[in-house]
Design a protein with these regions (language model features):
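Conserved alpha/beta enzyme-core scaffold
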Residues: 1-151, 164-326
C-alpha cells in the first residue's frame, strides 16, 4: 500500500499540537529542515523536541513559537556556537530543557524501542547532567562486580545471585528512562512508496528513534521502485511497516548535507547565525525562508539554481558492489 503523501498532508495528519517530535537524529547530516519548516508554516504549538546535538532547525522552530520543551544534548549552530532563539527562550521565557548526552539520548530511545522502562549505564556517574533530572535514577547493580576483562572481583567468572556468597555488587549505575516520541521525522536518500528506506552515512540515533516512535515520517530525496530497495536489503535501515508516511522532497535537508547528493551549505549556516540575533531579525528570516515560500520547490528557487548546482556532490565515492547470490 502506498504511503506517499505531500509534506503538507503528512505534517497536518500526523503531528498534532502538543506532540513530542524526534528529529535531527543523524547529528550534523540529513536534518529534515523541509519538515521542520512545514511544522512552522502550519503553526504547530506546544511541541517537545527530542534530539542529540541539535543544529539550527531546533532554534528556528523555537524562534517561530512552536516549542514548549526541549530534550537534547545541545542546541545551537555547530559552526558558529550558541543559538540565539534557544538562549532567549530559556533565559527570558522559561522554556523547559531536559539535558541529556548524545549517548543517553540513544539509551532512552533504545529502551523505548525494546519496550523496557529503562537501560542502565555508568557514563553519567559523577556528572551534573543527572542532577534534578527526571530521566535518571541511581541504582545498584543486581549482579557481581566485573573488572575490565569480564571477571568478577574475585577472578571467578561464574555468576552469583544477589545474596549469594559474594553478596550484591556495590556497583552504582544510572537507569536511563525510556523515551517514546509521538513522531519521529527522518531524512533519507531514497525510499519506495511503502516507506522502505535506504540510508547510508552517519546514522546517529536515527534507528533508535524510528523504532521508539509511535509514528514515523520518512522524507526521501527520491522515491524509487521496490526492486531498487530490495536489491540491497542491508541498506534498508527503515522497514516500511514502521513508517506512517513517506514524502519525496529533493533538497529537503538543506542546508545540512546528504551523502551522495549535496554538500553542507556553510555559507547558509553562517548567514542564518548572523541574521537571527534578535527576535525581529528572526521574524524577518522566517518571513523570507519559511513563511515566504509555499514549499521546498519555492525554497530552492529562492536559493537559486547556481547555488543548488554548486552544492551538488561533484566527487563521488562509490562503495564496492555487493553480491547477494548464494
Amino acid at each position: 500500500m502506498s504511503k506517499l503523501l505531500s509534506m503538507r498532508d503528512a505534517i497536518a495528519g500526523l503531528v498534532p499540537d502538543g506532540a513530542s517530535i524526534a528529529l535531527g537524529l543523524q547529528l550534523e547530516q540529513m536534518i529534515p529542515f523541509a519538515a521542520g519548516h512545514e511544522l512552522i508554516r502550519q503553526k504547530k504549538r506546544n511541541l517537545t523536541l527530542i534530539g542529540p546535538i541539535s543544529d539550527i532547525l531546533f532554534d528556528q522552530m523555537i524562534g517561530a513559537g512552536c516549542v514548549e520543551k526541549v530534550i537534547a544534548a545541545w542546541v545551537g549552530n555547530v559552526m558558529m556556537g550558541s543559538a540565539y532563539n534557544f538562549r532567549r527562550a530559556v533565559e527570558e521565557d522559561g522554556m523547559k530543557v531536559i539535558n541529556l548526552t548524545n549517548f543517553t539520548v540513544a539509551l532512552a530511545l533504545q529502551a523505548a524501542a525494546m519496550g523496557v522502562p529503562f537501560l542502565p549505564t555508568k557514563t553519567a556517574l559523577g556528572s551534573d547532567t543527572v542532577r534534578d533530572n527526571e530521566f535518571f535514577v541511581e541504582i545498584e547493580s543486581p549482579f557481581p562486580s566485573f573488572g575490565s576483562h569480564g571477571k568478577s572481583s574475585s577472578g571467578d567468572r561464574s555468576p552469583t545471585r544477589p545474596g549469594g556468597p559474594r553478596g550484591r555488587s556495590s556497583d552504582k549505575l544510572h537507569a536511563v528512562r525510556a523515551l517514546t516520541p509521538d513522531v519521529t521525522i527522518v531524512h533519507v536518500q531514497r525510499a519506495d512508496r511503502e516507506g522502505n528506506a535506504h540510508c547510508w552515512g552517519n546514522f546517529g540515533v536515527m534507528i533508535e528513534g524510528v523504532r521508539a516512535a509511535k509514528r514515523v515520517i520518512a522524507v526521501a530525496e527520491e522515491i524509487v521502485e521496490p526492486e531498487v530497495i530490495a536489491s540491497d536489503p542491508n541498506r534498508t535501515v527503515i522497514p516500511g511497516f514502521l513508517v506512517n508516511a513517506v514524502v519525496e522532497c529533493p533538497f529537503g535537508a538543506h542546508p545540512s548535507p546528504v551523502q551522495g547528493y549535496y554538500k553542507r551549505d556553510d555559507v547558509f549556516f553562517r548567514q542564518c547565525h548572523e541574521q537571527t540575533k534578535t527576535r525581529q531579525d528572526t521574524a524577518a528570516w522566517l518571513d523570507r525562508w519559511v513563511y515566504g515560500v509555499t514549499d521546498r520547490k519555492a525554497y530552492m528557487n529562492q536559493l537559486g539554481g547556481c547555488r543548488v548546482d554548486e552544492l551538488g556532490v561533484k566527487q563521488h565515492a562509490y562503495a564496492a558492489q555487493a553480491d547477494f547470490g548464494y
